[in-house]
Amino acid sequence: DKCNKLVPLFYKTCPAGKNLCYKMFMVSDLTVPVKRGCIDVCPKNSALVKYVCCNTDRCN
């Protein structure tokens, strides 16, 4: 699987077991992701951050 890095022009091949792509947003600004990458399980959202996860190549 491949996931975008923070700058979507670049991407990385995910290590084994980390086959979800994610975008992390600050709840205060849901328009600009602050982090992107590969992850094994989608984290829970909190009061400060929101995660958006997906499972196809470069879907983040």
From Swiss-Prot:
It is found in: Secreted; Target cell membrane. Its main location: secreted. The keyword Membrane applies. Disulfide bonds join 3-21, 14-38, 42-53, 54-59. Keywords: Cardiotoxin, Cytolysis, Disulfide bond, Membrane, Secreted, Target cell membrane, Target membrane, Toxin. SUPFAM superfamilies: Snake toxin-like. InterPro entries: Cytotoxin_Cobra, Snake_3FTx, Snake_toxin-like_sf, Snake_toxin_con_site, Toxin_cobra-type. GO terms for biological process: killing of cells of another organism. GO terms for molecular function: toxin activity. Expressed by the venom gland. GO terms for cellular component: extracellular region; membrane; other organism cell membrane. Transmembrane segments: none annotated. The keyword Protein biosynthesis does not apply. Pfam families: Toxin_cobra-type. Monomer in solution; Homodimer and oligomer in the presence of negatively charged lipids forming a pore with a size ranging between 20 and 30 Angstroms. Shows cytolytic activity on many different cells by forming pore in lipid membranes. In vivo, increases heart rate or kills the animal by cardiac arrest. In addition, it binds to heparin with high affinity, interacts with Kv channel-interacting protein 1 (KCNIP1) in a calcium-independent manner, and binds to integrin alpha-V/beta-3 (ITGAV/ITGB3) with moderate affinity. Belongs to the three-finger toxin family. Short-chain subfamily. Type IA cytotoxin sub-subfamily. This is Cytotoxin KJC3. It comes from Naja sputatrix (Malayan spitting cobra). The lineage of its organism: Eukaryota, Metazoa, Chordata, Craniata, Vertebrata.
